[in-house]
Swiss-Prot record:
Keywords, in A-Z order: Amino-acid biosynthesis, Histidine biosynthesis, Metal-binding, NAD, Oxidoreductase, Zinc
Protein name: Histidinol dehydrogenase
Annotated positions binding Zn(2+): 262, 265, 364, 423
Superkingdom, taxonomy of origin: Bacteria
Reaction equations catalysed: L-histidinol + 2 NAD(+) + H2O = L-histidine + 2 NADH + 3 H(+)
PANTHER family: HISTIDINE BIOSYNTHESIS TRIFUNCTIONAL PROTEIN (PTHR21256:SF2), HISTIDINOL DEHYDROGENASE HDH (PTHR21256)
Gene from which this protein is expressed: hisD
């Protein structure tokens, strides 16, 4: 029987092995930066001509003009109308729940009125134009379209652009249907680093955007990293991952399937179980092997779970939680007797799934919170994609005459200390 790599916190070599595990998110972008930089430069200097050439090279069809890259909204409408009723119902259910959750996130403008007549506050404004990158082809994910588009819609973004690779010029019908559901009219058959560059810098036919969000391969991730500063981005994400905290009460068949739910995404995905129960660990090994036999993506899942997966035996649940905080997984399932009791101790995770009836896939599709999450330990400082990614804040200041007289001399003193005479005089002129 094959077994998932196992670490035990009581062994001398544990720290070394655990530190190696923490490097799971390290992706060597250095090898692809020259290629991606070249593609970006071509888009910046050649515009649509470069886009057409890149589509011909990478997606294996030959558009004659930039007009052919844009998908007619009527095709999206037709794709939506062609959906079977149950699938349309599922998409609408997902849309409504995602919209409801992200509406609760939306920040509000505010003003604070001081006694001396001074007004301070914050104005929250949506971005003018957002670019969504959605992987395409046979592996197109309409759920990714919903998760990226709906926060932008809730934020109030007026113009939403979608770029998606379309091999052999065959758009994914389900993705087109999801675009229609979201009311998106501007969809381009462009993928990879070329799409990121086009959205960041603009071409003759594709106007530049203010923020780019969405998942992609290492070329897409590298391109997003390189154009950051020209535009805002959501995050630089790597392969998918799941961490599971479990005690002896967890059901081994469920734990096994939950680990495999991420392993089937990608050979580079990480699936990690941390538990104080050796009995559970042994049972999960058996159940993983059993489940693999009936999975369509057995080859990918098997390679992922046995080369990138791990089971960590902790001395108790306190240590298990501490180790999981170091891992800071993209998805964290808490399969213990009292999951909410451990919630205050969990500090670092993209999304936290509490209880045995909350498997990670429910968050991928229908729960409501966003499934675009920080990976590779970046949950220590990054947050999930949210409505706020599509909004920006401006500070508001309005001083009354009394207000500036009360604070002006303090301001002038600080400006003088920093040697900025014009700053000082600008304030003092109003105190005469």
């Amino acid at each position: 029987m094959r077994k998932i790599k196992r670490l035990n916190s009581s062994l001398a070599e544990f720290r070394r092995e655990f530190d190696e595990l923490l490097l799971r998110g390290n992706v060597d972008m250095d090898t692809v930066i020259p290629v991606v930089s070249g593609l970006i430069k071509e888009i910046r200097t050649q515009g649509d001509a470069a886009l057409l050439a890149h589509v011909a090279k990478f997606d294996r069809w030959n558009p004659k003009s930039a007009m052919e890259l844009k998908i007619d909204p009527s095709l999206m409408k037709r794709a939506y109308e062609g959906l079977e009723a149950s699938l349309r119902e599922a998409l609408h259910s997902a849309y409504n729940r995602i919209h409801s959750f992200h509406s609760k996130q939306k920040p509000q403008s505010w003003l604070d009125f001081e006694e001396n007549g001074t007004i301070l506050g914050q104005k929250v404004t949506p971005m003018d134009r957002a670019g969504l990158y959605i992987p395409g082809g046979k592996a197109a994910y309409p759920s990714s379209l919903l998760m990226n588009a709906i926060p932008a819609i809730v934020a109030g973004v007026k113009e939403i652009v979608v770029c998606t690779p379309t091999p052999e010029n065959e758009p994914n019908e389900l993705l087109l249907a999801a675009c229609h559901l979201c009311g998106i009219k501007e969809v381009y058959k462009v993928g990879g680093a070329s799409a990121i560059a086009a959205m960041a810098y603009g071409t003759e036919s594709l106007g530049r955007v203010d923020v780019i969000t969405g998942p992609g391969n290492i070329y897409v991730a590298t391109a997003k990293k390189l154009v950051f500063g020209q535009v805002n981005i959501d995050m630089v994400a790597g392969p998918s991952e799941i961490g599971i905290l479990a005690d002896e009460s967890a059901k081994a068949p469920w734990v096994a399937l939950d680990l495999l739910s991420q392993a089937e995404h990608d050979e580079m995905a990480s699936s990690i179980l941390v538990t104080p129960s050796v009995e559970l660990a042994d049972a999960v090994d058996v159940e993983v092997e059993r489940a693999l036999e009936r999975l369509d993506r057995k080859e990918i899942s098997s390679k992922s779970i046995y080369t990138r997966g791990a089971i960590i035996i902790a001395k108790d649940m306190n240590e298990a939680v501490s180790l999981m905080n170091e891992i800071a997984p993209e998805h964290l399932e808490v399969l213990v007797e009292n999951p909410f009791g451990w919630l205050p101790e969990i500090r670092h995770a993209g999304a936290i799934f509490l209880g045995e009836n909350t498997p990670e896939p429910i968050g991928d599709y229908i729960a409501g919170p966003n499934h675009t999450l920080p990976t590779g330990g970046t949950a220590r400082f990054y947050s999930p994609l949210s409505t706020e990614h599509f909004m920006k804040k401006s500070s508001i200041l309005s001083f009354s005459e009394r207000g500036i007289r009360e604070l002006g001399h303090h301001c002038a003193k600080l400006a003088q200390t920093e040697g900025l005479d014009a700053h000082k005089e600008s304030v003092l002129a109003r105190l005469v």
